[in-house]
Amino acid sequence: MNNEHRLEAAPALQDKDESIYQALMTAIVEHQLPPGSKLPEEALAEVFAVSRTGIRKVLQRLAAVQLVTLTPKRGAHVTSPSVEESQAIFRTRALLEVANLPDVIARCQPPHLAALENIIQREQQAHEAHDGPAAIRHSADFHIQLQAISGNPVLTEMVTRLSQRSSLVIAAWGAPWRQGCRCDDHQQLVGLLRDKALQPLSEALMHHFDHIVASLCFERDGVSLPDFSRLFAGHKES
C-alpha cells in the first residue's frame, strides 16, 4: 500500500473504530449488555468485521471511562459496580448537580425550559411504549442538558460520564429501567427552575437522587453471554 492509500485508509479506520465504540457504549448504557457480560474479542471482531486488534482498542477506550473492565487472562466484561461504588456515584452526582444549580438558574432562558420539556415528553412516550433503552437515554439527556445550561463544559462532561456509570448501577442492581428517574420528578424540577426557586429546586433534586438509590435492590443475578450477532445486526455492513 502506497503512502496515498495509507492516508485514505486511516480516517476510514478511525471512523469504524468510533462507530464500534459508540455501538458498544450505547448497548452498555441502555442495558442491552448487562453488567458482568463477557466481551470476547473474537466474537466481537466477527460481528463488526474487524480485527481483534481493532476490538481491543475499542475495549481499552471503554475501560478508560469505566464502562468495561479488563482482567488479565480473563478478558473484558461490562463493568459491574460494587454497592459502595454505586452509592458513591449517585452521591457524587448529587453533590455536583446541586452545587451547579445557582449557575443553571442564572443562565436559564425560555428556550432552555422548552428543550427540557421536550425531553420529558419524549421520555414519557418511551415509558408508555415500554421502550427501556429510549427511556434511559432521555432520562440521562435531561440531567445532562439541565446542567449544560450553566455554560460549564467541564462539569457537563463530568455529569455525562457519571450518568453513563449511573445507568450501569441501575442495570447491575436489579432496578428495572422504569424504576430509575421518574418523569414527574423531572417535571417538578423544570417547574422549580422556571420559578428560579433555588432552595426548593436543590431539595427536589437531592430527593430525586435519594429516590433512585432507594429503588435499587442490592442483589445480583447471574449473567450469560449476549447474542452479539442479534444485538449488533447491521454493523458489519456499515
Question: Locations of the language-model features?
Answer:
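Short helix-capping and inter-helix turn/linker motifs at the boundaries of alpha-helical repeat units
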Residues: 15, 113-114, 177-181
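Hydrophobic residues in alpha-helical segments
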Residues: 28, 104, 127-128, 150, ...
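C-terminal regulatory/effector modules of DNA-binding transcriptional regulators
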Residues: 177-238
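Short linear motifs at protein or domain termini
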Residues: 1-102, 106, 213, 217-238
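Mobile beta-alpha loop/short-helix "lid" or hinge segments that flank ligand
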Residues: 64, 68-69, 162-164, 178-180
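Conserved amphipathic alpha-helical segments that form helical-bundle/coiled-coil interaction surfaces
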Residues: 85, 89, 110-171, 183-191, ...
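Long, hydrophobic, amphipathic alpha-helical segments used as structural scaffolds
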Residues: 104-108, 150-154, 158, 170-177, ...
